[in-house]
Regions:
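Preference for long, amphipathic alpha-helical scaffolds in soluble/luminal domains
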Residues: 1-265
């Protein structure tokens, strides 16, 4: 923690709202919320009440709920936010539709965050007030969970990313699904990828992205251009991407997504 009660994405990174709020929520759940951070939140949002935090986060991220909804769910689970009704809902039911329809639905999250759409949506639904349509929405939960099972890689890590995987595990646990296979595999991934100092990398596999950046940086000084070209071409996806629906031939952050492996790019 920096002197002003804030955090960055890493020890060397400048402070930012997202890292600060998530860390604050974690400490709040343990009864160790720093007073300095409350001052930061007051300066940033005008206060640290439910409305201040919810409106502040939603205004910061705009209409895209890819990050704002999971962040607010964590705050609610930790007790930073007490009124679930004020938090945004996500239409987890839409996940059961054929992927080709997603482009027409104006989903509140980006396509690679469908796991978050499902987990956050189920949690928010189960924590909210019941109404006439609640039984219908409840009936979609098993179907949505089947989609989540299909999207989860063998190692349990969604997109090889600790944040997305942790959000899914947190939300499913909060929704009473802590013993579900998706939750258990997600927890296993987090336990397997934690560093010795207790931290996690933002992503466990950025090999393809880092390789291409290095190639660009080296330019004409690259010693074996032909071999590197072959490696990059080989890392192109060979099948349709299960999250985004992208056609074969594209690249992701990692080289773990191939025609023979189940996982994210």
């Amino acid at each position: 923690m920096k002197r002003d009660g804030t955090w960055g994405d890493s020890l060397e990174s400048p402070s930012n709202m997202t890292a600060t709020l998530l860390t604050y929520a974690s400490l709040y759940a343990l009864g160790e919320a720093p007073e300095q951070t409350k001052k930061y939140l007051t300066d940033k949002f005008g206060g640290y009440s439910d409305s201040h935090i919810i409106n502040g986060v939603l205004n910061y991220y705009g209409t895209d709920r890819t990050f704002s909804a999971p962040i607010l769910m964590m705050c609610a689970l930790a007790g930073v936010i007490s009124d679930w009704e004020k938090t945004p809902q996500l239409p987890f039911e839409l996940s059961v539709l054929p992927q080709r329809f997603f482009r027409f639905l104006q989903l509140p999250v980006v396509s690679y965050a469908i796991p978050a759409l499902i987990a956050v949506g189920i949690l928010r639904f189960r924590k909210g007030k019941r109404n006439l349509f609640s039984p219908l929405r409840e009936s979609f939960i098993p179907k949505s969970l089947k989609v989540l099972i299909r999207l989860q890689p063998n190692d349990g890590g969604f997109l090889e990313a600790a944040p997305l995987t942790a959000f899914v595990a947190l939300c499913l646990t909060g929704a009473g699904l802590g013993d579900h296979s998706v939750t258990e595999k997600a927890m296993a991934f987090l336990k397997a990828t934690v560093r010795k100092d207790g931290s996690w990398p933002i992503d466990t596999d950025l090999s393809n992205w880092v390789t291409t950046l290095c190639v660009k940086a080296l330019g004409d000084d690259l010693s074996d251009k032909q071999r590197m070209t072959q490696i990059i071409r080989r890392n192109a996806s060979a099948v349709r991407h299960p999250y985004t629906g992208a056609q074969p031939g594209g690249w992701g952050w990692s080289c773990s997504f191939t025609s023979t492996k189940k996982g994210g790019a």
